[in-house]
Amino acid sequence: PYDEKKGLRFHKDNILLDPYARAVTGQRHWGERPEGGKDFVYHARVVENNFDWEKSCFLNHPFEDLVIYEMHVRGFTRDASSGVKAPGTFEGLREKIPYLKDLGINAVELMPIFEFDEMEDTRVVDGERLYNYWGYNTVCFFAPNTSYTSVVEHNHEGDELKNLIYELKENGIEVILDVVFNHTAEGNEKGPCFSFKGIDNNIYYMLTPDGYYYNFSGCGNVMNCNHPIVRKFIIDCLRYWVINYRVDGFRFDLASILSRDQNGAPMENPPILQGL
């Protein structure tokens, strides 16, 4: 039963998104709300996993030799000066690989590319609509962001990202993902309930005794990373991106959250860090 004071937020009429979904119906075009308007509901999609990696493998550059270029997928090519055919997309970034190679870098760190909703911020400043530009508010951890794809058709975002990673590796460039496991896009008690909250709010988030959300992340909620179920979810996610997308490494946003127990206290030996 629904009981906010006990941290129970599931409602029988609320459609929930599978946290393990490999693809999500989302923003086909950046800044445009799909059919459903403000009441749009995220749905999982079935995807094919038939990308041919040929002989692509992990480059294993020595850590001390890495020259890392941190970038935002959309921001890197969105301006016309980038000269690409598909600006602001995975494909647009692939077009710029010769430029990256000329710089002499041997790794790129992609700022968040997991599914997020740039339309969640409804504020207006000086007459301009604000967007969740950076992507640090994850909707689905196993799914590439749909608005970063250049072709509007189902399942293309995964193959387009894999093609980018394949071409980067062919040019000696490793791929590191910026991952955000400290909080999610569901926010605090005033935020939406579309996934973890409805599945088991008490397990996935750190809650106060009266059912409110601890906010050590500064983003409304905190993932309960050292609970066995959440810990398994995180490790499953990282393993998925390594196996299926051949990702070389990860940068953990606000990694100190990974060291906290369910009440927010720092742990001497956090299980999630030991697992990683």
Walk through the language-model features, giving the residues of each.
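Substrate-binding/active-site clefts of carbohydrate-active enzymes
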Residues: H72-G92, P98-R246, L254-I272, L276
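Conserved, function-defining core regions and hallmark residues within catalytic/recognition domains
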Residues: R251
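The feature marks proteins involved in alpha-glucan
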Residues: P1-E70, T77-K85
